[in-house]
A protein has these predicted regions:
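Sec/Tat signal peptide C-region and signal peptidase I cleavage site
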Residues: 19-23
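Bacterial N-terminal signal peptides
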Residues: 8-18
Length: 397
């Protein structure tokens, strides 16, 4: 990138966000090579801590509720996903397939991380030919909705913007630093799945017959809007942000009081990111059963913004499951409720767990103050009670 363009990116980003957090005195980020050399050891340490226990699943008290996820027919074909996965695998070289395919019950499912430093398995987009990339995108398009596909691509593009804002550091950040693995063999009847893993974008996609589980999934970005550069104008997670705030503001004063865990937000609040598969997290916030029907529908619409990243027909199956448990759902909030506030919200039921969080600067600390701001968002979707990665379905198969 030319120096003039790079300079305009840094200035524009600082002006755009100065009303959220006063910029620190600009400093130089540490040389990329110094950090990259530590990545393998950092990854091994994260895995050693995060995978020390066998998978159980996220629970409210350490025990999973049984019978929530029966093996059944949904009537929604997964054939397009299977065909796309076969085409992707066929496009790879023999050596690429060896490092991309794992057994369906492999620990590889749980080896994902949002951070850019994590050393990932599989075949990376950066190492793919154009034909292989198209096959990979074909798998994503078959699995995701148009909304989910656009969000995924925009997150990848904003990772390029992040590289631009770090003095063209495309060793750590970039559009193509995302990896795909396939677990099992694509099948119409046997369990299998695939995973997309990279900075601010993780999709775990399990298939059994015509059932699909697309959790854990992670959607985020820093920045959330490209003020300039190659992908100027790209924006993500605004709908999830605005709809969350609108729902909170729809609550009565008493309901807001119940929903609010804390009014201030000095730091990061997400709890269910990488290597938190067995987190014990009790319900908190306002019980949805106490809300009006119109409020319940508004909350279901907010949930739909996340669920509908899944292909539309499968998303409807998931929404029905979530709706059936609406009276067992809780909504919690941290932070302010003004138009410019930073905040965290959590939607938690026996069958879905969603977190949205405005985070502190992580990869732009050389530009912004060390407080949460709207240009760094993390959102995580989980299936509690043992069915992340489709584990409960796999257990029953």
């Amino acid at each position: 990138m030319r120096k003039s363009i790079r300079a305009s990116l840094l200035v524009a980003a600082g002006l755009a966000l100065s009303w959220i957090a006063p910029a620190q005195t600009p400093s130089q980020p540490a040389p990329a090579g110094d950090r990259v050399a530590r990545f393998p050891a950092m990854s091994r340490e994260a895995e050693a801590k995060g995978l020390a226990e066998p998978f159980k699943g996220i629970t409210t008290n350490g025990e999973t509720l049984k019978g929530l996820f029966p093996v059944r027919s949904t009537g929604v074909s997964t054939e397009p996903v299977r065909v796309a996965a076969e085409k992707f695998l066929a496009a790879l070289s023999e050596e690429q397939r060896r490092r991309t395919q794992f057994p369906v019950d492999d620990l590889e499912w749980r080896k994902w991380m949002n951070q850019s430093f994590y050393v990932r398995q599989g075949t990376g987009f950066k190492d793919m030919t154009q034909a292989q990339r198209e096959a990979a995108f074909g798998l994503m398009r078959a699995s995701l909705s148009a909304k989910g596909m656009k969000l995924s691509r925009d997150i990848m593009k904003l990772n390029h913007t992040l590289g631009e804002l770090n003095h063209d550091n495309f060793v750590e950040y970039g559009e193509w630093l995302y990896w795909i693995t396939v677990m099992g063999t694509p099948s119409a009847s046997e369990p299998w799945g695939w995973q997309l893993d990279g900075h601010h974008l993780i999709v775990n996609y399990f298939v059994l017959g015509d059932q699909v589980v697309m959790t854990p999934s992670f959607w985020g970005s820093e920045p959330t809007y490209a003020e300039g550069g190659k992908y100027r104008g790209t924006r993500v997670m605004k709908d999830e942000q605005d709809a969350g705030l609108a729902f909170m503001k729809s609550l009565t004063p008493e309901q807001r009081k119940l929903a609010t865990l804390r009014g201030d937000k000095p730091g990061n609040d997400n709890l269910t990111e990488a290597f938190k598969d067995n987190l014990v997290l009790d319900y908190a916030g306002v019980p949805v059963r106490t809300l009006s029907e119109s409020q319940k529908r508004q909350l279901l619409s907010l949930i739909g913004l996340y669920v509908h990243n899944l292909r539309d027909d499968q998303a409807r199956v998931e929404i029905d499951q979530v709706d059936a448990r609406m009276n067992d759902t809780y909504f919690a909030w941290i932070g302010g409720t003004e138009a410019s506030s930073v905040f965290y919200y959590r939607i938690h039921s026996p069958v879905i767990l969603i977190e949205f969080d405005h985070q502190k600067p992580a990869n732009l600390r050389h530009l912004y103050a060390d407080v949460p701001y709207r240009e760094h968002v993390h959102a995580v979707v989980r299936t509690p009670n043992g069915n992340d990665y489709g584990k409960d379905l796999l257990r029953q198969h």
